[in-house]
């Protein structure tokens, strides 16, 4: 066993979005930066390896296959295998490029191994039998979050209960799939596998699927996934999971309290992710954590150890790659700028569920706006009824709804819910308008390209009506 010591101006633990961007920016100033990553399969972070990029690649291929009309099992299996190959090539190329970009900085060093704090100023890196002690003026914790399996009796012991990470690696595709959790990840994977003919059953504990959206939007979304062959049960409580010889049984209580059984080939659990702090040695530092296990930070993302910052999912903020990127901007402002940026600056952060069509949202729902005391107008229209938006028809995606919640006194957009093809692009324009106080009338009267989904804003926003 060998032990060495190195010192850097900055050490980043975890090769994710915020950390890698910060490491590159810091190294470009001539500072010595170390990037510590425990797995070469995670260069670039969760997003490009097991998260956003590979899953959206699978969503894309699944949508293509569904549209092809080839629904026999042989074609479905071949298409799924092809999608997996495409995904792996894509993530492999992005992984290599991320390493290349980091190491193109002369003062940046990639260190493979597991990092564990010895104190506020020292980290021990272990790789096999080798150990390295690294000291730094500044540490960045960027370890992300990991999928968890809840303490359902039998679930953690089961060989057929998988996380989203594990399900992505599963080949051939299952013929029957149960999904526990009806949030964005659960809905996304339900859509992927149902497109290839897998019999998918979604179990959601909340009273209604898509319950955080307004009723009209939620109902439209539920109808769409039902028509795609996805069976969804809300208001359920999963009791036990039991492995069989070549299947797994989920025992649950339905919304009426009746005992039900679901037998499938595999179960994916999508009930949440937890901050990845295990094994970091936080007990050896002055870093405090929240009641949910996240690293506690202030509005500048500084931990309770003044020389240590935490970026991305590990700090308990919204678990989005683009939030991690903004975390980088906040910390860079502290280290190399005027210190003016903070997490308090964030407004109108959008999100998308990648179902087919995608469901994108930002700001307040109608329900939330009324509860907050706003006097509002609502502009809403089914996609099929928007005459001035032929783009949806040319793409053969005429289903969905576009809805806006508007402050009746100021004409400011308070929120939007867009269940429509390409909504993940349009929602960014809406969020930008909200952040910069552009009114609904200004968005309504703007000139947009044709045919596009964006031009639907002309027609939808022209039909705002008061709501009491």
Regions found by a protein language model. Name each.
Residues 213-220, 311-370, 445, 450-468:
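A conserved FAD-binding loop/helix module that cradles the flavin
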Residues 157-173, 261-338:
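FAD-site-proximal beta/loop scaffold in flavoenzymes
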Residues 52, 141-199, 231-232, 283-285, ...:
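Glycine-rich dinucleotide-binding loop and its adjacent helix/turn
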Residues 14-17, 180-183, 213, 313:
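Glycine-rich Rossmann-fold phosphate-binding loop(s) that bind the pyrophosphate
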Residues 13-41, 46, 53, 57-58, ...:
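Flexible, glycine-rich terminal cap/loop adjacent to redox cofactors
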Residues 19, 183-186, 324:
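Catalytic nucleophile loop
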Residues 2-8, 17, 25-31, 36-173, ...:
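Glycine-rich flavin
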Residues 11-13, 115, 133-144, 179-180, ...:
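Short hydrophobic core segments
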């Amino acid at each position: 066993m060998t032990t060495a010591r190195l010192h850097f101006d900055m050490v980043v633990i975890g090769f994710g979005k915020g950390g890698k961007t910060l490491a590159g920016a810091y190294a470009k100033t001539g500072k010595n930066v170390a990037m510590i990553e425990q797995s070469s399969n995670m260069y670039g972070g969760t997003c490009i390896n097991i998260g956003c990029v590979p899953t959206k690649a699978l969503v894309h291929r699944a949508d293509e296959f569904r549209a092809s009309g080839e629904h026999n099992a042989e074609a479905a299996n071949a298409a799924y295998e092809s999608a997996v190959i495409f995904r792996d090539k894509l993530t492999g190329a992005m992984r290599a490029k991320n390493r290349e970009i980091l190491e193109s900085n002369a003062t940046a060093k990639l260190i493979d191994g597991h990092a564990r704090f010895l104190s506020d100023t020292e980290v021990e890196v272990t790789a096999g039998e080798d150990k390295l002690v690294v000291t730094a003026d500044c540490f960045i914790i960027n370890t992300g979050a990991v999928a968890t399996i809840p303490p359902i009796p039998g679930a953690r012991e089961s060989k057929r209960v998988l996380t989203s990470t594990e399900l992505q690696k599963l080949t051939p595709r299952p013929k029957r799939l149960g999904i526990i959790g009806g949030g964005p990840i659960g809905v996304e994977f339900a859509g992927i596998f149902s497109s290839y003919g897998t019999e998918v059953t979604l179990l959601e504990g909340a009273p209604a699927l898509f319950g955080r959206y307004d009723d009209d939007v939620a109902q439209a979304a539920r109808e769409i996934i039902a028509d795609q062959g996805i069976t969804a049960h809300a208001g359920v409580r999963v009791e036990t999971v039991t492995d069989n010889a070549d299947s797994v049984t989920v025992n649950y209580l339905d919304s009426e309290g009746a005992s039900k059984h679901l037998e499938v080939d595999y179960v994916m659990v999508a009930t949440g992710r937890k901050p990845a702090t295990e094994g970091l040695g936080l007990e050896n530092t002055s870093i405090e954590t929240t009641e949910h296990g996240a690293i506690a930070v202030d509005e500048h993302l500084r931990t309770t150890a003044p020389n240590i910052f935490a970026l991305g999912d590990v700090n308990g903020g919204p678990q989005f790659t683009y939030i991690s990127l903004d975390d980088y901007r906040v910390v860079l402002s502290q280290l190399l700028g005027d210190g003016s940026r903070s997490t308090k600056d964030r407004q109108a952060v959008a999100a998308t569920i990648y179902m087919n069509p995608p469901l994108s949202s930002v700001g307040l729902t109608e329900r939330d706006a009324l509860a907050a005391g706003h006097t509002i107008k609502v502009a809403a229209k089914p996609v099929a009824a928007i005459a001035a938006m032929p783009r949806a028809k040319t793409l053969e995606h005429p289903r969905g709804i576009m809805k806006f919640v508007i402050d009746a006194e100021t004409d400011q957009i308070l929120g939007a819910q867009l269940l429509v093809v390409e909504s993940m692009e349009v929602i960014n324009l809406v969020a930008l308008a909200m952040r910069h106080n552009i009114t609904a009338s200004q968005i309504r009267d703007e000139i947009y390209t044709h045919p596009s989904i964006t031009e639907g804003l002309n027609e939808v926003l022209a039909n705002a009506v008061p709501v009491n």
